[in-house]
Amino acid sequence: MYLHLGNNVLVRKNSIIGIFDMDTATWSKRTRDTLSMVEQAGQMENAAGSELPKSLVICSLGSGQRYILSQLSPATLLRRSRSTGLENL
């Protein structure tokens, strides 16, 4: 099964490591530094388009990780994941 993150971006539900709220996740300097490093390395995907991202989804990708910004709120993504059978988030 897949979870739709917005703007035609889909991820496999079993690859999701976590869904984080961008409002609270960026309070920590350590988190901001990590996100900056990921973005500078070109590993950040923007599914939010021109809208302000509301959530960050981290997925496993082979031996690495995939970081995706979404314009959908974490609550919406969680509701969608549960309706598709992703109960462990």
Task: Report residues per predicted region.
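Eukaryotic intrinsically disordered, low-complexity regulatory linkers and tails enriched in Ser/Thr/Pro
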Residues: 1-89
